[in-house]
């Protein structure tokens, strides 16, 4: 019986040792698993934070790009509308009654004739300009109306064409026109 007791003691000791080793192994495995889960959570959290940051940056870029595109389209439309207004004004000047054209030419000639020796006009206004001015008629120019005055030797030219007057007024008034049209 002595041997059976020794064998039994060894078996119980071995079982106790196996149980202790299993318990330690389970504890160590649980600790490693928990650490791995924590590392995984941290990595996932970091990844999510990076993705959220990247999405926020991308969102901001898309919004900025969209805003720039809207501004570009708006400015192009405003320019197009202002160009249309300019074109309509040119057409209104071209089609104004002869009496009004004569009145405007008379005003320009009376006011500025002393500044020149020769006068130019459009072909359509030639007869009226010859009638209203005492200056030498020097020829026709390509314009919608008005006159150009020139000194004797041609070194000084004063442009009082409707084209240049309209262009100057248009450029000076561009901001004001834009404010009126677009509030």
Curated annotation (Swiss-Prot):
GO biological process per UniProt: proton motive force-driven plasma membrane ATP synthesis
Family note: Belongs to the V-ATPase E subunit family.
Protein name in the entry: A-type ATP synthase subunit E
Coiled-coil spans in chain: none
InterPro entries documented for this protein: ATPase_E_C, ATPase_V1_Esu
GO CC entries: plasma membrane; proton-transporting two-sector ATPase complex, catalytic domain
This protein's encoding gene: atpE
GO molecular function, one term: ATP binding
Record note on quaternary structure: Has multiple subunits with at least A(3), B(3), C, D, E, F, H, I and proteolipid K(x).
Subcellular location: Cell membrane
Function statement: Component of the A-type ATP synthase that produces ATP from ADP in the presence of a proton gradient across the membrane.
Main localization (coarse): membrane
Pfam family, one: vATP-synt_E
Topology within the bilayer: Peripheral membrane protein
Keywords, alphabetical: ATP synthesis, Cell membrane, Hydrogen ion transport, Ion transport, Membrane, Transport
Transmembrane segments: none
């Amino acid at each position: 019986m002595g041997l059976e007791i020794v064998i039994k003691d060894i078996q119980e000791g071995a079982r106790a040792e196996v149980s202790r080793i299993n318990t330690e192994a389970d504890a160590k495995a649980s600790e490693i698993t928990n650490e791995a889960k924590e590392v995984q959570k941290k990595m996932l959290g970091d990844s999510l934070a990076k993705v959220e940051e990247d999405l926020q940056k991308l969102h901001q870029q898309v919004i900025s790009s969209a805003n720039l595109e809207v501004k570009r389209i708006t400015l192009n439309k405003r320019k197009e509308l202002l160009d249309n207004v300019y074109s309509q004004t040119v057409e209104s000047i071209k089609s104004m009654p002869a009496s009004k054209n004569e009145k405007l030419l008379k005003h320009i000639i009376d006011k500025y004739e002393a500044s020149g020796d020769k006068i130019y006009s459009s072909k359509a206004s030639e007869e009226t300009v010859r009638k209203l001015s005492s200056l030498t008629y020097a020829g026709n120019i390509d314009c919608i109306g008005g006159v150009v005055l020139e000194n004797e030797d041609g070194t000084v030219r004063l442009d009082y064409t409707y084209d240049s007057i309209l262009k100057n007024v248009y450029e000076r008034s561009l901001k004001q026109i834009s404010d009126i049209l677009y509030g």
